[in-house]
Amino acid sequence: MHRPIPTRPTRPTRPARLASRAAAAAALLVLLPAVPAAAAETPHLDAVERELRTVSPGLEGRIWERTAGNTLDASTPGGADWLLQTPGCWGDSACAKRPGTERLLSKITENVSRAQQTVDVSTLAPFPNGAFQDALVAGLKTSAARGNKLTVRILVGAAPIYHLGVVPSKYRDELVAKLGDDARNVDLTIASMTTSKTAFSWNHSKILLVDGQSVITGGINSWKDDYLETGHPVADVDLALKGPAAASAGRYLDELWSWTCQNKSNISSVWFASSHNAACTPSMPKAPVAAVPRGDVPVIAVGGLGVGILRNDPASAFRPHLPAAPDTKCVVGLHDNTNADRDYDTVNPEESALRTLISTATRHIEISQQDVNATCPPLPRYDIRVYDALAPKLAAGVKVRIVVSDPANRGAVGSGGYSQITSLAEISDTLRNRLTLLTGDRGTARNTMCSHLQLATFRSSSAPTWADGHPYAQHHKVVAVDDEAFYLGSKNLYPAWLQDFGYVVESPAASRQLTAQLLGPQWQYSRPTASVDYEQGICPAA
């Protein structure tokens, strides 16, 4: 049978072929889902995440969590006022105008006023007072007046004896009175808690969370006497954020509230009060995932449980090398959770996160803290592994800048006690000693330190003190590396066994804003106090 030979089609011209291919490609793009741009490299977050999966794998999604799609919550897209500073009066020792404080208070009211279901407040005792309380109440009234039925949890950490006057039922009554008729739409659950008296452990986190979608967190305590109604306000900083990492803060608070509710009948640990006979609320309703527009900032939320909530992470196979140092212990023989307790490590992943973040630096590290060393006794003098993270960085030529609160603030815990050292030499001597162990030679250690370290006490103006004569007090908890990533939260670098929370953020754009708005002006005014400064050739005697 004869098979017919098909006729060969006419070959289209080159322009026609290109047009046809372009049309086909365009049609295909319409049919396919949008593909996001390749994610930016995140070496710092990746290293922290790996460490947390080793140390505390069973606490992922509860105490720590990595998320993408977050937005730093500025008043304008790309703005820098997601960084909430108090008082924000750089260059003015009289601090007549306090734009940072004003922005913080207005942001508190703004966020709370948008609440539709839930508001979480967490801080160190005493309860928010003065304009802090007014900002919270104003937001609650605005939301409630719109007909929203709100569940509000307020949790403070209470130091034994020191905070005996912090009474939840009294604060509930204050809020109900200030809310007036709007109180009928607000269910208040209020508690103070202490998880371990012998280990000095209580809530120290500072979180304002609204509907699990927006969060303000950092180091700022809501205390009028220290931050507002004074001529020498504490320098401090929070960040504002929207996105999945806000919900991470809610899951962390649920852990603290679960313990609080379980122990609310034990008056030696928990004092509890509520309005409308509301029960203790161990967990809040979860916000819908699609409720917040997605951003582009990757974040690790990371907290710690201190002592008394959970002994260890049963899922962890972590086996750390725990270095020793003879000068970490003082007179009191208190168990050293920071330097000598593997189980403590597994339920306080934030400490591993901070050490790891420091270790990821390749160019420079900025540390802005109240202190790097603790009050000894009763606590260990310092975290050996923090210094042992810094020492090899200095030896490798990484520049390190440390700014701490003026030691003239040394005093009792709480108001007025914003330093725990007597001299910057406590820090530089410790760092030199750890470098000596690393290099094997004291002279080499000194030269290494003085070639790469800057160490100073905080000032916010060119004057040596505030206009009223008081020393500058700094309460930051910031660690920044390479203008690429930073930690901002409530966790100090010195030993303290509290419940704390913060974020590790990897964003070069946000890191540049942090430098421009805080770290740059800080060094401009603090530099004259430097006891070590490789740029000025200042070096302590051998």
Model-derived features with residue positions:
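Bacterial N-terminal signal peptides
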Residues: A23-A34
